[in-house]
C-alpha cells in the first residue's frame, strides 16, 4: 500500500459520517467503508464519480456526487470527519470552501488534508509548474489559512520524505517532505463558544 494512503488511514478515527472532498477514484471511500455508517464522496470529475460508483457497487451507505467543491447541500454540523486529500491546491475560492467545510463539520470533528509542499519544490530546485495547482503555499501558510478558517492544528508532518526514509525526520523536518499532511480540528463557532 502506498505510504501516503497508509498514513492517512492511520489518522482517520472512526465516526458516524465521513465526507471525502475531491474523492477522485474513491480509494479512501473503499478503504474506510467499514469505519463509518455514512460516507459521502464529492468530485468535480464525472468520470471519477462513475468509476468510484463501480468500485463501491450498490452500498446504500455511500453517496457519490459530482459537483463543485465549494457549496454543499448538507446540514450544518453533519460530519465527523472530512478528507481533503490533494484537493485544496486546486480550488479557486479556498476561503469559501473552508468556510463551507467548517459549517458541515461538527465541533471537534477532524479534517485531514494533504497538499503539495511548495517549500520542498522550491528547495529541491524542481519547478513543477502545474496549471491546476492554484494554491501553492508553504506548510506554515497552509496552517495559518486553516487556523483562520476556524480549525486548530492537531498534527502536521511530511509525507514522502525524499532523501532519507526516516519516519522520525518526516515528522520533525516537515518542510522537506514532498507532501504535507495536516490533521485539523473544527473549533466551535466563535459566537457559540
Language-model regions: role of each:
Residues 1-75, 81-85, 98, 135-140, ...:
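Conserved N-terminal segment of class I S-adenosyl-L-methionine
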Residues 17, 109-110:
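Short glycine-centered segments of the SAM/dcSAM-binding site in methyltransferase folds
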Residues 47, 92-96, 123:
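Short N-terminal helix/helix-N-cap motif within the alpha/beta-hydrolase-1
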Residues 86-90:
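A short His-aromatic
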Residues 95-107:
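A short glycine-rich, Lys/Arg-flanked "PGG" loop and its adjoining helix->strand segment in the class I
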Residues 114-134:
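Short, glycine-/aromatic-enriched active-site segment of Class I SAM-dependent methyltransferases
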Residues 148-152:
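Substrate-binding/catalytic lobe of Class I Rossmann-like enzymes that use SAM or dcSAM, i.e.
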Amino acid at each position: 500500500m502506498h505510504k501516503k494512503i497508509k498514513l492517512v488511514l492511520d489518522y482517520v478515527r472512526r465516526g458516524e459520517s465521513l465526507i471525502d472532498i475531491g474523492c477522485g477514484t474513491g480509494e479512501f471511500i473503499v478503504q474506510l467503508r467499514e469505519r463509518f455508517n455514512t460516507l459521502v464522496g464529492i468530485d468535480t470529475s464525472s468520470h471519477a464519480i462513475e468509476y468510484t460508483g463501480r468500485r463501491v457497487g450498490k452500498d446504500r451507505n455511500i453517496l457519490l456526487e459530482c459537483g463543485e467543491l465549494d457549496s454543499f447541500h448538507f446540514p450544518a454540523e453533519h460530519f465527523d470527519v472530512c478528507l481533503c486529500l490533494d484537493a485544496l491546491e486546486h480550488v479557486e475560492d479556498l476561503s469559501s470552501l473552508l468556510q463551507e467545510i467548517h459549517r458541515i463539520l461538527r465541533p471537534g470533528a477532524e479534517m485531514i488534508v494533504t497538499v503539495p509542499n511548495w517549500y520542498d519544490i522550491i528547495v529541491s530546485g524542481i519547478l513543477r509548474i502545474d496549471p491546476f495547482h492554484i494554491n501553492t503555499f508553504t506548510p506554515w501558510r497552509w496552517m495559518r489559512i486553516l487556523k483562520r478558517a476556524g480549525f486548530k492544528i492537531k498534527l502536521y508532518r511530511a509525507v514522502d520524505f525524499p532523501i532519507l526514509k526516516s519516519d522520525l525526520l518526516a515528522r520533525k523536518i516537515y518542510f522537506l517532505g514532498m507532501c504535507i499532511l495536516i490533521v485539523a480540528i473544527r473549533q466551535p463557532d466563535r459566537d457559540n463558544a
